[in-house]
């Protein structure tokens, strides 16, 4: 018995697809070799019978049968076909007898009569198309929408300088007469101009040796250059001067120059074709032309009779001659040059004296130049990264232009009838629009450049091209509105919470996991989370059963499950011991970075919500307005150790992207700290007024009355004097104090006083020293009071500080959190507070 192994994928890559690769995805053939992948009809199904129309968007011949092993004629695969050539295919309708599941992954193909640009590479910022061409966004959109056109030659050429052409060094080579007909392929320079082969000059050189003779003058040709090549055109004789050296009169037309109207280009050519004379100065930019290497192996060949091009075809012709590695090298060289210039400019700026008006003007000029060069360096950096991506991914820039449009399988864009109404996917409407508009594209008439009817036919043809480009944009990215209802594009169906990825492919259910709403848990520690009891029992049920059996409480799994179902108290105690050493993983979708999933030690809480510390919310990008989080339980000891070492929340203090602190107090925390520590007292301007605002101890009835030591211990101080923090907490819980009430508290350690700014130079400002009738010495400072026994120098020193209950509570939270503060007052304390 053989077992079938599932395919194993090491990695998956997303990159540009070549036109040839798109054809390979969709190519299928009849046994006689006829292709069956092209969708030529815009029809979908018959709305009466709901049967797919032939050659349409739901064609059974292209995408497979609707019913398993049944062709469009209704014949099943049990009836054998006598003709072995059509074994597996119906000889009448041509439908393959196979499973209907193939309709979920078989692709179709729409062959576009004119290439169109992929809208995602145009709309994205920065646009890869714009970076490759070096055009502005406005200009790129104008060419794509067929509002402007370019002059593109039938054969791209690049030019050498006169220095390279007329070099006399022995290593230099010159083009021989016999080599003129041979293909000499080089790469297109980043800023080289494109010329027609009949416009380009032809030079015939003989091999030269070192000699003292100089070249004479170069005379122009007496023939006019021609823009369009015709087969019946005869080659006119050419004049040869100066020992076989010849040079044609030539004005270059850049390949990236655009014209909005045909009439403007005709006017330009009218002056370009004007006869030139030998005494006019020649343009030193050109010498002789060479062929340019093209990356068109995987691009379908198209007949090009016009040098005027617009839309995707113009961009494809330009991009097909781009050499990514050469461009990247040139940009690196230019960036180094500009960096050196920037250093010189910055040195000049530093040497200027800004006290003088002339230097200020010069500084502004240099600053504007520096900003422009910085922007230029940024642009070149993006271009280098783009060309490097093309080179690493083994792709070509010309593949951003679509020659063939793949059609999604019918299973992903269904059409059905519900209650007598036909319901179809929005994608079908876009495909129908593309097919209809693509049929309108007709080949251009072979008109002369100065033909009077060229302008009108050109505008009509450009309008049809623009319609096809807009239809493809609606399918891929923008969508449209039909009868007041928005139609979703392919991008809309993929992105967002309701898209294909997040709604259907992601969010799978996993064992030992749960999901619930998160609420704030301010009493939790940073590494803790609150886990509902009911959820914890279900998640940790195997661990509870194991502990119950190990401790001898039960002996079978069934008995343990009964004990857990009854929610016995022993279950909660066992679960609490397990949770002390067993972390859980909390995850909030979407997990965009590694901090989106962290480990916590759970604590059992009542309710059905997960408690989360507020400081860990920024890492999850979570808030408490209904967000949900998933809980995952690491099962093995190895995974638990890995979770505590790598994912524990107390170790994720710094953001991995920037290194900045991740757990920062939020605005409500800062506001809470301020509210907790502020006082009701207003800022006093004079120090003398501070004495009257503080009651001294001899004014208090608490110190004037003689009481025994037990009464002093068990009674609450009157007139806002306290000897312990617990007494402050008790008075606050009863309601005798507020957070901002000024009080005096006994304190033996150091204290930070709130001294006004004008007294900050002094350590403490002494307000008054008093001596009572009983011999007790009292010293009053701004925020502290000191009392000494009658023995003066050898007596015990007692210090009281002036503070508020809010500051005491904050001190307890920071420094004495482990000490248990009494939450309920005793009966004697309640009586003494009620008397006040």
From Swiss-Prot:
Keyword Hydrolase annotated: no
Gene Ontology biological process terms from the UniProt entry: DNA-templated transcription
Disulfide bond sites: none
Cofactor requirement: Mg(2+); Zn(2+)
Molecular function as annotated in GO: DNA binding; DNA-directed RNA polymerase activity; metal ion binding
Keyword annotations of the record: Chloroplast, DNA-directed RNA polymerase, Magnesium, Metal-binding, Nucleotidyltransferase, Plastid, Transcription, Transferase, Zinc
InterPro entries per UniProt: DNA-dir_RpoC_beta_prime, RNA_pol_asu, RNA_pol_N, RNA_pol_Rpb1_1, RNA_pol_Rpb1_3_sf, RNA_pol_Rpb1_clamp_domain
Subcellular localization(s) per the UniProt record: Plastid, Chloroplast
Enzyme class: transferase
Binding site for Mg(2+): 623, 625, 627
EC number: 2.7.7.6
Residue sites binding Zn(2+) per the record: 71, 73, 90, 93
GO cellular component assignments: chloroplast; DNA-directed RNA polymerase complex; mitochondrion
Pfam families attached to this UniProt entry: RNA_pol_Rpb1_1, RNA_pol_Rpb1_2
Domain of life: Eukaryota
Catalytic activity: RNA(n) + a ribonucleoside 5'-triphosphate = RNA(n+1) + diphosphate
Cofactor note: Binds 1 Mg(2+) ion per subunit. Binds 1 Zn(2+) ion per subunit.
Self-association and partners: In plastids the minimal PEP RNA polymerase catalytic core is composed of four subunits: alpha, beta, beta', and beta''. When a (nuclear-encoded) sigma factor is associated with the core the holoenzyme is formed, which can initiate transcription.
Entry function: DNA-dependent RNA polymerase catalyzes the transcription of DNA into RNA using the four ribonucleoside triphosphates as substrates.
PANTHER family with a match to the protein in the record: DNA-DIRECTED RNA POLYMERASE, DNA-DIRECTED RNA POLYMERASE SUBUNIT BETA
Record-stated family: Belongs to the RNA polymerase beta' chain family. RpoC1 subfamily.
Name this polypeptide is given: DNA-directed RNA polymerase subunit beta'
Gene: rpoC1
């Amino acid at each position: 018995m053989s077992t079938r192994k599932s395919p194993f994928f090491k990695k998956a890559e997303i990159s540009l697809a070549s036109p040839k690769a798109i054809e390979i995805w969709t190519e299928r053939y009849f046994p006689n070799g006829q292709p069956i992948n092209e969708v030529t009809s815009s029809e979908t199904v018959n709305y009466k019978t709901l049967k797919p129309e032939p050659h349409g968007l739901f064609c059974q011949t292209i995408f497979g049968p609707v019913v398993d092993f049944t062709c469009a004629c209704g014949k099943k695969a049990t009836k054998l076909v006598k003709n072995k050539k059509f074994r597996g295919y119906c000889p009448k309708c041509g439908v393959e007898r196979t499973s209907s599941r193939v309709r979920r992954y078989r692709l179709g193909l729409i062959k576009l009569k004119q290439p169109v640009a992929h809208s995602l590479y145009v709309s994205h910022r920065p646009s890869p198309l714009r970076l490759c061409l070096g055009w502005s966004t406005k200009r790129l959109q104008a060419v794509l929408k067929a509002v402007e056109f370019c002059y593109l030659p039938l054969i791209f050429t690049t030019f050498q300088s006169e220095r390279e052409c007329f070099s006399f060094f022995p290593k230099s080579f010159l083009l021989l007469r016999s080599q003129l007909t041979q293909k000499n392929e080089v790469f297109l320079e980043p800023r080289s101009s494109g010329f027609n082969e009949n416009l380009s000059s032809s030079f015939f050189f003989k091999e030269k040796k070192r000699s003292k003779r100089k070249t004479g003058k170069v005379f122009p040709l007496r023939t006019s250059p021609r823009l369009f090549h015709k087969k019946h055109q005869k080659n006119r004789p050419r004049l040869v001067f100066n020992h076989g050296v010849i040079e044609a009169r030539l004005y270059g037309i850049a390949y990236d120059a655009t014209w909005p109207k045909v009439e403007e280009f005709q006017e330009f050519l009218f002056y370009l074709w004007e006869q030139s004379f030998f005494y006019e100065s020649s343009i030193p930019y050109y010498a002789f032309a060479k062929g340019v290497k093209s990356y068109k192996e995987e691009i379908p060949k198209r007949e090009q009779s016009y040098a005027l091009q617009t839309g995707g075809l113009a961009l494809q012709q330009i991009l097909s001659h781009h050499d990514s590695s050469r461009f990247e090298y040139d940009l690196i060289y230019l960036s180094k040059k500009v960096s050196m210039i920037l250093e010189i400019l910055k040195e000049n700026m530093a040497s200027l004296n800004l006290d003088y008006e002339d230097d200020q003007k010069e500084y502004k000029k240099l600053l504007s130049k520096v900003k422009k060069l910085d922007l230029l360096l940024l642009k070149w950096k993006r271009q280098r990264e783009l060309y490097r991506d093309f080179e690493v991914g083994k792709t070509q820039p010309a593949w951003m232009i679509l020659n063939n449009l793949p059609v999604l399988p019918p299973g992903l864009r269904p059409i059905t009838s519900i209650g007598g109404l036909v319901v179809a996917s929005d994608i079908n409407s876009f495909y129908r629009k593309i097919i209809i508009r693509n049929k309108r594209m007709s080949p251009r008439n072979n008109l002369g450049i100065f033909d009077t009817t060229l302008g009108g036919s050109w505008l009509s043809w450009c309008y049809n091209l623009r319609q096809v480009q807009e239809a493809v944009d609606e399918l891929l990215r923008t969508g449209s509105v039909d009868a007041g209802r928005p139609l979703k594009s392919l991008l809309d169906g993929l992105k967002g919470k309701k898209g294909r990825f997040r709604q259907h492919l992601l969010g799978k259910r996993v064992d030992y996991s749960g999901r619930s709403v998160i609420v704030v848990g301010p009493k939790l520690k940073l590494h803790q989370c609150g886990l509902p009891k009911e959820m914890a029992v279900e998640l940790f049920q195997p661990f509870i059963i194991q502990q119950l059996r190990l401790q001898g409480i039960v002996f079978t799994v069934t008995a343990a499950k009964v004990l857990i179902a009854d929610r016995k108290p022993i279950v909660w105690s066992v679960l609490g011991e397990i949770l002390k050493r067993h972390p859980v993983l909390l995850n909030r979708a979407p997990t965009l970075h590694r901090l989106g999933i962290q480990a916590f030690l759970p604590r059992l809480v009542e309710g059905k919500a997960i408690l989360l510390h507020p400081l860990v919310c920024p890492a999850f990008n979570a808030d408490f307005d209904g967000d949900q989080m998933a809980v995952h339980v690491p099962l093995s000891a190895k995974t638990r150790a890995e979770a505590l070492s790598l994912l524990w929340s107390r170790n994720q203090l710094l953001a991995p992207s920037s290194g900045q602190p991740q757990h920062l107090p939020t605005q409500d925390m800062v506001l809470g700290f301020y509210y907790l520590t502020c006082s009701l007292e207003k800022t006093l301007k004079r120090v003398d007024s501070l004495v009257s605002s503080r009651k001294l101890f001899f004014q208090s009835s608490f110190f004037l009355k003689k009481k025994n030591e037990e009464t002093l211990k068990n009674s609450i101080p009157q007139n806002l004097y306290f000897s312990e923090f617990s007494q402050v907490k008790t008075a606050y819980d009863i309601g005798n104090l507020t957070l901002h009430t000024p009080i005096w508290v006994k304190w033996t350690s150091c204290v930070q006083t709130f001294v006004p700014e004008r007294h900050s130079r002094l350590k403490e400002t002494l307000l008054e020293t008093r001596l009572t009738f009983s011999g007790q010495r009292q010293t009053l400072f701004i925020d502290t009071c000191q009392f000494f026994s009658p023995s003066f120098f050898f007596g015990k020193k007692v210090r009281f500080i002036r503070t508020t209950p809010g500051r005491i509570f904050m001190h307890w939270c920071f420094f004495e959190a482990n000490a248990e503060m009494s939450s309920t007052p005793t009966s004697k304390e309640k009586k003494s507070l009620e008397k006040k």
